[in-house]
A protein has these predicted regions:
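An active-site-proximal structural segment forming one wall of the substrate-binding cleft
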Residues: 92-109, 126-155, 175-189
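Extracellular/luminal regions of secreted and cell-surface proteins that mediate adhesion/ECM remodeling
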Residues: 319-471
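Active-site groove signature of glycoside hydrolases
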Residues: 111-121, 140-173
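Boundary/entry segment of secreted carbohydrate-active catalytic domains
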Residues: 28-73, 77-79
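Catalytic cores of secreted or luminal carbohydrate-active enzymes
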Residues: 281-333
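Catalytic-core regions of glycoside hydrolase
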Residues: 153-155, 164, 168-302
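C-terminal motif of bacterial Sec signal peptides marking the signal peptidase cleavage site
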Residues: 17-19
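Aromatic-lined substrate-binding rim segments of carbohydrate-active enzymes
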Residues: 60-118, 129-133, 190, 194
Length: 471
């Protein structure tokens, strides 16, 4: 009987055979996630009813305004009556800087307006000359630049009665060159990512020409045309909103169409000023709040109008929908991953508010567990999440190969864009869903059970050390 000689195969060949015999384990299967919408008002930053506060002269507990009363915005006049003919004293600048620090400490933001009088109309107290206004803006610039993080946006102010750009005792409301110079100075005084609001559509048209598209506006870097919104301080008070519209030969319909386009990418707000049924009642109020993308409104004025909304059953809806109201609809994601493996995530979000978020902020995916990893999605701009629309975000993410095994949570984080506010929970956006918000971290939790498991399937990249978007 012959003997067969057994020949040892090289080690490399054995490994190759083993690899052929053991194919790579498949990628983990995505799981469908669903979410329950909330019917509650969500106390979110840079939106909602605001309360008027004189931040310079009136000591205010801003944290109480936010936590007990639900305000994330305050509107503050800064009165300059005593300085119509002279420079601002350093004490006033210091007081304003301190007040803005208190706003920051309390976790809210402010809508500023500088004014030299409080009317009356039509025989207003004086405002200041063009030259003095420009000098005051120059003096204020360092304070505004240093505190831009807590300035939501700024009403143009300075000119005329109440700073509303009418009834100027120096004729500035009728001086195009003065208007242009003052607006240029205001935009330069603020950080480039902050906007101003003007009282009259005609002034906005004069300054920007035709509206941009929202896509062009968010792509613009420090472009004046993308930084001028509107405040209507007599919303619903008459057919023309007490002269807000139908000025200088332009029809109401033309001006409303213009403002509808402008406010798709700029802040819109203001206040009601007198009861005017049926125009000021719920049906038309809801229609125009949505059409003109209202982000904020005065909670204190006009009381008769606000009471009519409460009696008409729409006040709670208005409170919930001022500005953005983002809600998770559904998501799909694999809930296990190997270190160095891939998370395949798709999320659908609906905006039930009247407006999109005004100021830029990142959208980040966070893997939170034995270690925390977060990555911004640079292709996503939440300012384009338009009201009434549903947006789907699909992204593939590589988990670090050195991620510790264990149980994690997967969430979305929308922090403030300012570095000093990024980790402040009160400045993060909360989705309008049940049982997704984590008040300890500011995360919107997509799934509370997500495993980093070395035994999971899928192809890995062994050298990666960061949580990253896969192009």
């Amino acid at each position: 009987m012959s003997r067969h000689r057994l020949t040892a195969l090289p080690l490399a060949a054995l490994l190759a055979l083993a690899a052929c015999a053991t194919p790579p384990r498949p990628e983990p299967t995505p799981v469908a996630l669903t979410f329950t919408p909330s019917d509650q008002n969500v106390t979110n930053p840079e939106r909602g009813f605001f309360t008027p506060v004189d931040i310079v002269t009136t000591p205010t507990n801003f944290e109480t305004l936010r936590t007990a009363l639900g305000y994330t915005l305050v509107r503050s006049y800064v009165r300059l009556d005593d300085y119509r003919d002279q420079d601002l004293p350093q004490t006033l600048l210091d007081d304003l800087d301190h007040a803005l620090g208190e706003v920051r400490a309390g976790g809210v933001k402010v809508i500023l307006r500088f004014a030299y009088n409080f009317g009356p109309y039509p025989d207003s107290e004086p405002d200041a000359s063009r030259e003095q206004i420009l000098r005051h803006i120059a003096q204020l610039t360092p304070v505004l630049q240093a505190n831009g993080d807590v300035i939501a946006w700024m009403e143009a102010g300075f000119v005329g009665a109440w700073g509303e750009w009418h009834t100027s005792t120096h004729g500035l409301h009728a001086d195009p060159e003065a208007k242009l110079a003052i607006v240029d100075a205001l935009l330069a005084a603020l950080p480039g990512d902050r906007m101003i609001q003007l009282r009259y559509p005609g002034d906005i048209r004069f300054l920007i020409g035709e509206p941009l598209t929202p896509e062009a506006a968010v792509a613009a870097t420090d472009d004046a045309r993308a930084r001028i919104g509107h405040h209507n301080d007599c919303f619903l008070a008459s057919d023309s909103d007490q002269g807000t519209y139908e000025r200088e030969g332009v029809t109401i319909d033309e001006e409303k169409a213009f403002i509808e386009d402008v406010t798709a990418y700029t802040p819109m707000g203001g206040e009601t000023c007198q009861n005017n049924p049926p125009r000021s009642e719920c049906p038309i109020a809801l229609e125009e709040l949505a059409r003109f993308h209202y982000t904020e409104l005065n909670a204190s004025f006009n009381k008769l109008v606000l009471r009519s909304w409460e009696q008409g059953g729409c006040l709670a809806e208005i409170q919930k929908r001022l500005g953005y109201r983002l809600a998770l609809e559904k998501a799909s994601v694999n809930t296990t991953v190997r270190p160095g493996g891939i998370i395949d995530l798709t999320v659908t979000v609906r905006n039930d508010g009247f407006a999109a978020p005004v100021n830029a902020r990142p959208l980040e995916v966070v893997l939170d567990g034995p270690s925390r990893y977060n990555v911004a999605l640079p292709a996503v701009d939440v300012r384009l999440w338009a009201p009434g629309q549903t947006v789907t975000v699909a992204v593939r993410l590589r988990v670090p190969a050195n991620a510790p095994a264990g149980e994690y949570r997967l969430g979305l984080w929308l922090p403030d864009a300012a570095p000093g506010l990024r980790d402040r929970l009160e400045y993060a956006i909360q989705f309008a869903n049940v049982d997704t918000w984590d008040p300890e971290t500011g995360l919107n939790i997509l799934t509370p059970t997500f495993a980093v498991d070395p035994q999971a399937g899928g192809v890995v990249e062994p050298g990666t050390t960061i949580f990253a978007v896969i192009p």
